[in-house]
Regions:
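Non-catalytic interaction/Regulatory regions outside core domains
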Residues: 1-133
């Protein structure tokens, strides 16, 4: 895993990991994307990249982690959830389950195309899984 120090939102320096790079790339490749967050199974942010303050994407990630946990708990005979999509009049949220311990989520404006979000978040998920080994 490589590390670089780069300016974060608000001008403060932060340590840039391979996880950050994957998240930054997905945000850059999806028109309208606002941020992406890599989460553990409890909804705690492992890493994030956002065009908005990172606190917002971390809080959103925590809430999405809780939703995925609830879906897993109540899915029963339907099987394990693979993704969660929430569309509102102001945002589209996509969460992919990476494995039994990790998730990745992408937030975008309503203009973002879900198919593009899914394709690019899958690319990021592949990079994240590779780095997790």
């Amino acid at each position: 895993m490589t590390y670089d120090v780069v300016p974060a939102f608000g001008g403060r320096a932060r340590l840039d990991t391979a996880f950050t790079v994957a998240l930054r790339e997905v945000v850059a490749r999806v028109p309208g994307a606002r941020g992406a967050v890599f989460l553990d199974g409890d909804g705690e942010a492992v890493d994030e990249f956002a065009e908005v303050p990172t606190t917002e994407i971390r809080i959103l990630g925590a809430h999405l982690g809780i939703l995925v946990s609830l879906v897993k708990e109540h899915a029963g005979q339907l099987g394990e959830p693979l993704e969660l999509v929430i569309e509102t009049d102001r945002a589209t949220l996509l969460v992919l389950v990476l494995d039994d311990r990790y998730l990745v989520a992408l937030e975008a404006g309503p203009e973002a195309q879900l198919g593009v979000m899914r394709r690019e978040l899958e690319r990021a998920a592949t990079a994240l899984r590779r780095e997790m080994r």
